[in-house]
Amino acid sequence: FILIVFLPNGTYLLWKLENTYSKPKIFPDKIDGMLILGSGTDPLLTDQHGQVTLTESIERITESIELIKKFPDAKVVYSGGMPTAKSQEKLSGVDVAKMFFTRMKIDVNKIIFEDQSKDTYENFIFSKKFINNTDGEKWLLVTSASHMKRAMSVAEKLGLNFIPYPVD
């Protein structure tokens, strides 16, 4: 019992979770699409300060910029979310992501923004209509490394196949 209290178990467990999947070292010849699970933005502070405010999960967006440039013909779906009814947010995560992509000179007209989801399961449910990867299409799933195991599990249960691309 004493060892459990004094050892850095949380750090080890997070490390183990984050290392379940690794970034692909070699990509297929063609990437047909990528699904970016939203996070990394702070809509409330963005609205209050009038500037894009980012959070600790920003790598989901920043890394996706490199992927969009690397695979310019790939379909891109950003699954963000909407403010909850109790929230004071006037902007959604999708609104802030659009602002950020625009500032980074990414054409937001080439990105499909899904803005109805409120959790991981809904990310896939609402994005599924944009994704056709059951016929051998190669799609990347971009999300935080600590979130990837859960996201891949949900995707698999819904019959969606992805190449994991964990970030952060």
Predicted regions and their residues:
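A structural signal for short, hydrophobic/glycine-enriched beta-strand patches
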Residues: L3-D168
